[in-house]
Amino acid sequence: MTPISVTQLNNQIKSIVESHFEIVLVEGEISKVVYHSSGHLYFTLKDENSSINCAMWKSNLTRMKFRLKEGEKVYVYGALSVYVPRGEYKIIAQSIEPSGVGALQKAFEQLKEELSKLGYFDEARKKSIPRFPRRIAIVTSATGAALQDMLRVAGKRWQLTEIYLFNALVQGDGAAEDIAMKIKLADEFVFEDGSGFDLIIIGRGGGSKEDLWPFNERVVADAVYNASTPIISAVGHEIDYLISDFVADVRAATPSNAMEIALPDKNEILLMLDEMKNAFVYKISHLIQKKERELIHIRELLNASSPVKKLDMKLQECELLLKRFNHSYINQIQKKEKELNELKNILFSLSPVIKINSFEKEIELLKSTFKNKTAQIISSKEKELINLKSAYETLNPKKREKKGFAEITKNGKRIDLKELKIGDIFDVSNADVLIKSKALEKIEN
């Protein structure tokens, strides 16, 4: 037998192994996982008795939906490859699937766990949805049924909100990146008045897990998390839960439900406004009635104690006295005239001319005296009435101030000069000016 070199032997082994094991599907447990900076993946696949080194090149690794972890059981699909310089062989993996669970589900669970630890799902960071949004941005496909469903609901509930579409791919290659870009664009959009969108809705209609997968991608989760605008996630049907649902501020069961959450119902608002109006009218009416009763009470108190009221009462008393006076003297005059007539009759019956003349003079004197006395009394009462009116004018603070008088108050109350003490702070005011004063010296007259 002719001897061969080590390299020759390894090359022969390589030729035999790689030609006979072009495709292998191996089940085992993951260990020694290394994600290299070059983008390649290196790991060991083992069972109870053996192990084999494995590698997955960057070109295939980019298609994996989940990351390998120590201790996981997987199916590795690939081919055997021999490294001639060291005589080592390994599996060059083309794809890796979790054992017992689908790759997509595994990727979903891994990303969900990772984002949860990072605080992406914390309720404390989530923003509230505005009750009356002025502008809403919808990130979805322009040709999808989800958009039409949302517009139909919006037309029924509330027509005052402006709705803008950011057309995006919602499935297939590049969809996740396109959705993330449109979320960022809507979040940073600024109108001419300086304001942005009040709310963003992302979503699409139902579909398979693969169809909905873009909303499970990390790039979409990051875009939702970093947005300053409140976001509603409305993907698929009620039974579908996506990563975007957990990160968004609010999760809607369907796109139609998202619009029901986002917009108020005009009929409910009208009913609420009607109830508020009725309650307001009732309260105002009740308040007006209460204030009217208080006003009447205050007027009664003012009328009972006002100088005008007192003056009116004095005037009425004077008028009553004048009436009584006039009535009394008229009666006396009538009585004297009656007596005079009687005397005249007696005198005429006796025909003593001298006595008649004497009585006539006496009567004339009585008349003159009566008239003078009456005039004096009337004049006296008129003067008394004038004095009462003058006293009223004097008591009126505004009249006094216009005549040069000033009012002295302390702590908002009128006070006599005699009541002031040295050091007291008081106000001196008339109709035009108020002077803050302090008593420095007190001299009694």
Swiss-Prot record:
Molecular function per GO: exodeoxyribonuclease VII activity; nucleic acid binding
E.C. no: 3.1.11.6
Main location: cytoplasm
Disulfide bonds: none
One biological process term in Gene Ontology: DNA catabolic process
Key words, A-Z: Cytoplasm, Exonuclease, Hydrolase, Nuclease
Subunit structure: Heterooligomer composed of large and small subunits.
HAMAP family: Exonuc_7_L
PANTHER family cross-referenced by the UniProt entry: EXODEOXYRIBONUCLEASE 7 LARGE SUBUNIT
Annotated function: Bidirectionally degrades single-stranded DNA into large acid-insoluble oligonucleotides, which are then degraded further into small acid-soluble oligonucleotides.
Name this protein carries in UniProt: Exodeoxyribonuclease 7 large subunit
Lineage: Bacteria, Pseudomonadati, Campylobacterota, Epsilonproteobacteria, Nautiliales
